[in-house]
Amino acid sequence: VGLTASMLTAAEPAAAGTPETWTSTFQGSDGVTYSATNHLVAPAGGPGRQWMLVWSGPAKQPAPDFLTVIDATPDSPTYGKVANTVTVGPNNGNEPHHMQYVWHKGDRIYAGGIMGDTTFVFDAKALPALTIAGVNTAADTPCGTLPDAYQVLGDGTAYGTYMGGPNVTGPCTYTNGQVRVGNGAAGSPGEIVRIGKDGRTLAEIPAATEAGEDPAQCGNVPALPAATCANPHGIAVREDLNVMVASDFAEARNFMTPDSALKENLARQTVRVFDITKRDDPVLKSVSKVADGPRGAQEPRAFFRESRVVMETALTNRPGHKGAFVSSMAGGAVFYTPDITAPAPQWKEVFDDTTAYRTFQGDRQITGSGDNGSWLAVSPDDRFLFHTVMGQSVPYGKPLEQTTGMVYVLDIQKLLAAGNGAKCSVDELAEASRGGRERDCPELVSTVPIRDVSSGGPHWGAMDNFKRGADGVYRETTQVSRIAVANYFVAGSFGGGGDHRVCMFDLDRRGRVTLDRSFRDENTGKPCVGFNRASWPHGDYGDAQPHGVLFVVSDGVVRR
């Protein structure tokens, strides 16, 4: 296994208007040589600056998957313009999904291809250029498939959630010698994988309990000898607490098409907490469950009750806080526990997406039910909770204007200040649309509709955790002033495709969000960068599907 970089155009400068291209390669454990080819254009020049990485795939095959590098420096003359596209090869059709939630100086980029069962690792020291530094292939993770989300640790390695079951049906042995029986790729149980900076598998970690879980709640198709809800999607880590949290999504292969039957017992309600004292051998400490709220009793289809499809989790950050949040994709609700280190965390619903809808949508038939809540993040200073909602409301048929997507911000300071004595609980029907009545309930600070009436909406997002000083140097900040979201989920899924825009939002000190209209598409001149375009620096491949987004900074102008 090794890395090789070759300058393909070093002999002579690129012609005017022609991207400068160069390729780095990496030989995977499977013997395949993987490549990353940069296509640098004019906005890539000049001094170091801030960038946005967008991990995307083509809308039509065959065409390469690629990382887009966009100028994210507001006062730059090329703000919002594509500076580079980094195509990966030789395999296409990976279905680019998530990168890590937050980037820190020196971190490598972990980018997952959920359908290709591959994690690509990139070195970002030469931004806006990237070099391939590692690849984790399907053969490297025999006990899990569908790589989803990543958290990078202080040593530069990463934990990744692999939502689907083993490559092959039957028993699978994890790194620590434990064995679980699975029903195959994209099935159950999923796992956690610790990945090295070179893409190597450091540890495959079982997410399922050995004894199994409630078979009535944890359906598996086909059934397993020990039923499991272990289909981890979201992941959050507090190294100071030696804790890792993963939220369970669904047995994914049963929901690959828009007309898939929405079976209640395949919609997960569970959250898994691991002790990561031994980084290569985390111990599953608890499996807890979120419960339906007051709106659920009125929803005839259990799949759309508040507790269903627990897609995302987010941890608080400050030393005095141990709280954790999770959100449900099909249920449209946010839940909280004040102490994630407790032996058996107790979750309470603290916010219903219906309340956010009421700020701009008067139709009282529209609720959080089926609204496809997605990205969830706590600001580094523990003041705000950010949440995106795709807005495709399946119970109401086609995605229409009234079920538009949105991004909203909650002030969570009172809730966290209450500690273990937190009282907030959305348990009355009126609270679903007005917010919790307890004094420590989160306060809805801001809601911005994101009008996407295609088959999807705003799914993933990222916080800008950097601030530029008067000396031109960037340093990390706890006060987030910008967030970005991407309007795309997964091709062919019940969540839909979205309109393929990436939008930037400004955040004031009170947490109020406004669309950054200066972050414009270089072709249309409209706010948000559109990924529906005929040409890219790497060729005329047409529309692309942006999923993961991440703020990064040129190595020479960022300090820890």
Segments (PLM) and residue ranges:
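Structural signature of eukaryotic scaffold interfaces centered on beta-propeller domains
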Residues: 19-48, 95-106, 146-155, 164-165, ...
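Short, conserved, GDST-rich strand-edge loop motifs in beta-rich repeat architectures
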Residues: 47-61, 160-187, 246-268, 387-404, ...
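Short loop/turn segments immediately following beta-strands, especially the blade-tip
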Residues: 69-78, 121-131, 194-202, 262, ...
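Blade-loop segments of beta-propeller domains
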Residues: 79-153
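Surface-exposed loop and turn segments in beta-propeller and other repeat-based domains
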Residues: 81-96, 134-143, 200-230, 283-308, ...
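Asp-box/WD-like beta-propeller blade repeats and closely related beta-sheet repeat scaffolds
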Residues: 124-239, 247-260, 269, 295-304
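Beta-propeller domains
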Residues: 224-421
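Loop/turn-rich, solvent-exposed surfaces of beta-rich toroidal or solenoidal domains
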Residues: 324, 366-503
